[in-house]
């Protein structure tokens, strides 16, 4: 069906989708989002004429080429995003996995009208120098309410990239502090660092994994290896990259083979730590390689990584920028691993609204101003996090994620069974799921088509579609998606 004919059918309510039985939709302890739309509404092409006009206007000022459409955030509700042309889409992409409790959440709106929020918005402080009087209490009531086990310190930052960048700095400073036995800096170190020379500027490295993504600042980009276009023309550090396990699915049918794959990857990590020509001070790993294609490893692999880092005195950074804040059914994805000792550093951003990293006192620099910037985060985002955490607890959103994720996964298997070889490698935890298509072109075709049916989605890796719904996404929303996904497959693959 052509896109113009599709829009015509949609607008005349003649477009019939396969109905996944509503009687089989599971219930969750989470209440419905107040004032939410009942279902997607598509009136125009996407992007529509008003979005196209704004894209053309923006093009005169900055690069708009990545824009899907222009959003009308005032008109968006809960799990549904509105565009400027009046289309209402079920949002399963959620600002690249960064919206936790819905558009225009009433509790956030209520909080934003308070004097605390107004003061934080109009009097933005340099938190490291002149923190507001309620900053310690705000940290206790937000960040420390969800701190990973074993980590009692938090460094606040502005985004996921700078959270990881500052985590690398913390690792390097810790490594050198241990190396010099806690002694003061030498005059030679102090003078040589001003020339970018050793010993003050030591030659150290961070080990990362192929297909990983950790940001686009200079240090993080040297550890990002998901897409060439991110790295082209940018100088990079000569840091090692290990192979991340490429598991075979279904996992239960390939347990022996996958264990061998993970063992080989662990051996490679240890060999790189022992032999890389630049000493490895730390490693960074995502619980799920999100941007790189939703690549998974089992708890066995991560337990092995922790053992290796402890054995060799190498810091372990877990990048929970995309996986944190409950999307896998646990607040932190690394909770699924059952580690014998916690990671040294856990970084966060996206759904947390705020950004930064958790650590313990060993990773606090020996002097002030060493890991520092003007803002050191934003109190408004901490205030937002405080509300979000309250909503997660009050509305049982982690339980909701597990129930909703299971329903989504079952529905994907149901549809995949009717299209052998097309929908591949259904995988994930909670609602943090992904599927593969045979080629990038097939994946992109599906995303474009289902958008015309009122579902906003995103890809990752070479040929994957990633599911990144909000924590307030319920089985009823997934039922709407499954109907439209099934119809998309029919339209594209069954004449």
Swiss-Prot record:
Pyridoxal 5'-phosphate binds at residues 160-161, 374. Signal peptide: none annotated. PROSITE patterns: AA_TRANSFER_CLASS_3. It catalyses: 4-aminobutanoate + 2-oxoglutarate = succinate semialdehyde + L-glutamate. GO terms for biological process: gamma-aminobutyric acid catabolic process. Keywords: Aminotransferase, Pyridoxal phosphate, Transferase. Its cofactor is pyridoxal 5'-phosphate. Its EC number is 2.6.1.19. GO terms for cellular component: 4-aminobutyrate transaminase complex; mitochondrion. Substrate binds at residue 216. The modification N6-(pyridoxal phosphate)lysine is found at residue 350. InterPro entries: 4NH2But_aminotransferase_euk, Aminotrans_3, Aminotrans_3_PPA_site, PyrdxlP-dep_Trfase, PyrdxlP-dep_Trfase_major, PyrdxlP-dep_Trfase_small. GO terms for molecular function: 4-aminobutyrate:2-oxoglutarate transaminase activity; identical protein binding; pyridoxal phosphate binding. Belongs to the class-III pyridoxal-phosphate-dependent aminotransferase family. Homodimer. This is 4-aminobutyrate aminotransferase. It comes from Dictyostelium discoideum.
């Amino acid at each position: 069906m052509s896109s113009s004919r599709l829009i015509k059918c949609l607008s005349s309510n003649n477009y019939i989708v396969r109905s996944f039985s509503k009687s089989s939709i599971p219930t969750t302890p989470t209440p419905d989002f107040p004032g939410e739309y009942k279902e997607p509404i598509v009136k125009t092409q996407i992007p529509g004429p008003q979005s196209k006009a704004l894209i053309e206007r923006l093009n005169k000022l900055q690069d708009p080429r990545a824009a899907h459409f222009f959003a009308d955030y005032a008109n968006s509700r809960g799990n549904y995003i509105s565009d400027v042309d009046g289309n209402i889409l079920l949002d399963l992409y959620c600002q690249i996995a960064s919206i936790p409790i819905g558009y225009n959440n009433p509790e956030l709106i209520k909080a934003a009208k308070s004097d605390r929020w107004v003061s934080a918005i109009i009097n933005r402080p340099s938190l490291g120098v002149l923190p507001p009087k309620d900053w310690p209490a705000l940290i206790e009531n937000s960040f420390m309410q969800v701190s990973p086990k074993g980590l009692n310190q938090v460094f606040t930052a502005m985004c996921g990239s700078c959270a990881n960048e500052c985590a690398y700095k913390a690792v390097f400073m810790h490594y050198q502090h241990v190396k010099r036995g806690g002694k003061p800096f030498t005059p030679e170190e102090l003078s040589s660092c001003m020339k970018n020379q050793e010993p003050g500027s030591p030659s150290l490295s961070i080990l990362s994994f192929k297909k990983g993504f950790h940001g686009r600042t200079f240090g993080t980009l040297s550890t990002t290896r998901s897409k060439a276009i991110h790295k082209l023309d940018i100088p990079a550090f000569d840091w090692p990259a290990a192979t991340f396990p490429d598991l075979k699915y279904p996992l239960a049918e390939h347990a022996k083979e996958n264990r061998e794959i993970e063992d080989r990857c662990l051996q490679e990590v240890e060999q790189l730590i022992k032999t890389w020509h630049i000493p490895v001070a730390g490693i960074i790993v995502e619980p799920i390689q999100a941007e790189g294609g939703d690549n998974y490893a089992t708890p066995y692999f991560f337990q092995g990584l922790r053992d290796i880092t402890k054995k060799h005195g190498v810091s372990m950074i877990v990048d929970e920028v995309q996986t944190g804040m409950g999307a896998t059914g646990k607040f932190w994805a690394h909770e699924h691993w059952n580690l014998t000792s916690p990671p040294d550093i856990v970084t966060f951003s996206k759904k947390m609204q705020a950004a930064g990293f958790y650590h313990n006192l060993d990773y606090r620099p020996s002097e002030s101003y060493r890991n520092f910037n003007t803002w050191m985060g934003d109190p408004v985002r901490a205030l937002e996090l405080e509300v979000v955490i309250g909503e997660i607890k009050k509305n049982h959103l982690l339980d909701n994620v597990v129930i909703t994720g299971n329903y989504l996964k079952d529905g994907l298997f149901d549809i995949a069974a009717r299209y052998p070889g097309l929908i591949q490698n259904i995988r994930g935890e909670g609602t943090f799921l992904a599927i593969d298509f045979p080629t990038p072109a097939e994946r992109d075709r599906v995303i474009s088509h289902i958008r015309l049916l009122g579902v906003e989605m995103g890809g990752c890796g070479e040929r994957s579609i990633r599911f990144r719904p909000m924590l307030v996404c319920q089985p009823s929303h997934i039922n709407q998606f499954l109907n439209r996904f099934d119809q998309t497959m029919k339209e594209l693959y069954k004449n």
